[in-house]
Amino acid sequence: MKFAPCLALQVAAAAVALTSAAFAAEGLKLVRLANPVGGHIHPAACVSAKGTLVVTYGHVNHRDLRLTRSTDGGATWSEPKPFAPTVGKTYYPGSLTTLRDGRLLHAWNRWSEPTNEKEPRSVLYSLSSDDGLTWSEPKPFPRDEKIVSNIRHPIVELTSNQWLLSLSDKTQVFDPTTGASQPFGDGRAHGLVPIVRTPKGSFISGTGLRSTDVGKTWQAIAPFPNLKEQGWRHEMVCLANGWLIASEILGPGVGGERIRYVLSRDDGVTWGEVFEYYNPGRAIGGRACPRTVELGGGNIGVVFYDVEPKQAGGPGLFFLKLSVDRLGREAKIRSSN
């Protein structure tokens, strides 16, 4: 069964570009791609083989999960539409991944029943073969019905039939052809943190661990960005050139005041540089939950939210495009602030 959301015209007027005065990195354009109502907005993002940007986010807390697309590198976005497999059902936001064969994988969290908001949650996934226009019938990942199991980060595609899942309750290798799963590496549960594989074959865990033997043994990384304390919120991404970037949000309160990348250029061994890309000069509204994708052409893009009601346009979900060259050139030595 296919779910086909209504197609919407991309209109530049819907994506409001703000001036660089709104954030720290001069010359960057902040694009508004949606106006979420509130709650767990927690976006997910991926880029298709054709270059289409696909973003999902919570428009209404646990009740209205929406999807928007961009075919011009994030300059304009389609009108956000409800994600068809969750219409009329409750959800908790998940992740997006582009598979090697070009399909998009969207994994999200369901509650104990289709329309309630009670634990234990578990994970469903759906696939798209047309850049996010239509989606397959949802299927579940293996679960223990008595244990909460959540996903918030992209999977790692080890092979076409081996997906590494970083779930809140376990770290598993899932076979989509059989529906079976098995523990990854030494069997430890890393928790709800990102895990990435580098071009050299190393695995970096958001718990601050690094493995060069496919997870059989792990070595501690210190210092390392504090991803594990709020693993659902933060991100870690490996770029095509081998650099790794992780999110860091500084400042008091729920949302902090500044968002920056922490950069590793040596396969995840050291994390000594930072690049700040968002600083509105006030408290950020909400957790931001940044999600970064590599766009091609030497660029990356990051999606995050700021629901401060007094900002121009009110609460918003935003997109920011940045060149990898600039990231590397302007990164500064990391300090505690």
Briefly describe each language-model feature range.
Residues A25-N337:
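Asp-box/BNR beta-propeller blade signature and adjacent active/binding-site loops
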Residues S20-A24:
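Sec/Tat signal peptide C-region and signal peptidase I cleavage site
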Residues M1-A12:
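Bacterial N-terminal signal peptides that target proteins for export
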